[in-house]
């Protein structure tokens, strides 16, 4: 807990302090600081090119290339997946990534002074992604706290993003899927995002897939 707080909070407070100092000196400097930090914390390019390249490969009939790109994106083997499964998993990854790299970052940017919220969310997500699921003796406690802290920080943004999906898509189906299907996912946040996103888009996500020769229920 202390290690996580020391890693996240000082940087967050320092970011806010720089914003206030620059704004006091010149509002334009504060604005430029906001823009710079927000630009660095947004990660649109970290997922958009994967999604675009995968769908382009599928359209060109290059299933092997699409499979390789998906495996690289997800960090696990995509061997055995057919074109339909690849497209579905790419959509799932894109929905979750759009939230974690764009929508949630912007929301926290708005909630806290200056760009401090955006930086806090990005740091929390970084530690969750790299240590949140580790259970070894050296990093296990840090990983567990990183996971819990990120879940708390992400609680409100997840639901706002899901509501946004519903508003811009099929509202009734999105809300219905959110209420009835999200609880089936082991990852609550991903379940809410994928259920509401699937309902809004009118597609089916979260179906069983074949990974490493075995059927994975999700």
Write out the residue ranges for each language-model feature:
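Hydrophobic N-terminal alpha-helices or hydrophobic patches in metabolic proteins across all domains
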Residues: 1-218
């Amino acid at each position: 807990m202390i290690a996580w707080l020391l890693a996240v909070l000082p940087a967050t407070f320092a970011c806010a302090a720089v914003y206030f100092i620059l704004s006091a000196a010149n509002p334009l400097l504060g604005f430029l600081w906001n823009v710079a930090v927000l630009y660095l914390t947004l990660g649109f390019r970290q997922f958009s090119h994967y999604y675009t390249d995968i769908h382009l490969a599928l359209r060109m009939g290059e299933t092997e290339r699409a499979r390789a790109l998906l495996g690289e994106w997800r960090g696990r083997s995509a061997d055995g997946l057919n074109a339909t499964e690849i497209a579905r998993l790419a959509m799932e990854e894109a929905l979750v990534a759009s939230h974690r790299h764009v929508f949630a970052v912007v929301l926290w940017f708005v909630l806290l002074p200056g760009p401090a919220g955006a930086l806090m969310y990005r740091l929390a997500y970084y530690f969750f992604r790299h240590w949140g699921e580790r259970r070894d003796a050296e990093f296990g406690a840090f990983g567990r706290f990183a996971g819990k802290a990120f879940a708390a920080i992400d609680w409100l943004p997840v639901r706002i993003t899901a509501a946004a999906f519903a508003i811009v898509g099929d509202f009734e189906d999105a809300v219905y899927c959110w209420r009835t299907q999200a609880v089936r996912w082991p990852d609550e946040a991903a379940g809410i995002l994928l259920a509401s996103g699937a309902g809004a888009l009118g597609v089916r996500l979260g179906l069983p897939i074949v990974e490493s020769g075995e059927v994975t229920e999700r």
